[in-house]
């Protein structure tokens, strides 16, 4: 009977529970992550779902393996790529411009060349800054000045004329006074129109009639 009592006591013994501290820590680590930041989070979820509770101390190595599986899955995660949509749009905008229209296009080129690809989603703010740098450089561009060569030539032509020789010189003066400086390259047609207005006004000039007073007097005297 005594032997049976010992047998029963041994049979009633229960192993201590295995230590799940590492497992719980790994799960907490996994839960703290934003699954949407990663290309594929399924490995982590599978490792967490594979955890079996109620293992005892003789099975500690299995429990530790569960923790390691979660940690390994977390370590293998890859962030999604950053979104370069704004960068690509800004580059397309820059490429659509004619660099020769601007006084200095180097700022735009520098901003485009400073773009670094392959940033991940955690670096999105850097990528957005690249896009903004290009947009800012485009916004800061200044057109080259319009070419006033024809205008200046027409004005010089007008200034060389003796206004007293013409019946009405006001059209020429008005055309010269209508010249507006400071136009840029995109307004060249307006500048060319100023030159044409002066040229047209000069072409429309009419000389005053010659003075025949002395001739008439001489004829009268002869008669």
Model-derived regions, located:
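Beta-rich interaction/scaffold domains
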Residues: 1-223
